[in-house]
């Protein structure tokens, strides 16, 4: 009772084809296939074998310079 046989699925398929039509189902299939292909292409672009080149770190300023500039700006206001 809980399991559907192949005949149940065929009847459901026939009803769906009658409701939506074969053209609409074909368009849905093409859209779904295009979405899957786009997803796979996106995954391939993200998995490149090229090692990521680290960006050179900028030289850090002395932290007192920022504090001095902030104090000077607050005095001017």
UniProtKB/Swiss-Prot annotation:
It comes from the Bacteria. GO terms for molecular function: protein transmembrane transporter activity. It is a single-pass membrane protein. Keywords: Cell inner membrane, Cell membrane, Membrane, Protein transport, Translocation, Transmembrane, Transmembrane helix, Transport. GO terms for biological process: protein transport by the Tat complex. One of its GO terms (cellular component) is TAT protein transport complex. Gene3D superfamilies: 1.20.5.3310. It is found in: Cell inner membrane. Residues 40-77 are annotated as: Disordered. The chain crosses the membrane at residues 1-21. Residues 58-77 have a biased composition (Basic and acidic residues). InterPro entries: TatA/B/E, TatA/E. Belongs to the TatA/E family. The Tat system comprises two distinct complexes: a TatABC complex, containing multiple copies of TatA, TatB and TatC subunits, and a separate TatA complex, containing only TatA subunits. Substrates initially bind to the TatABC complex, which probably triggers association of the separate TatA complex to form the active translocon. HAMAP family: TatA_E. Part of the twin-arginine translocation (Tat) system that transports large folded proteins containing a characteristic twin-arginine motif in their signal peptide across membranes. TatA could form the protein-conducting channel of the Tat system. This is Sec-independent protein translocase protein TatA. It comes from Cupriavidus metallidurans (strain ATCC 43123 / DSM 2839 / NBRC 102507 / CH34) (Ralstonia metallidurans).
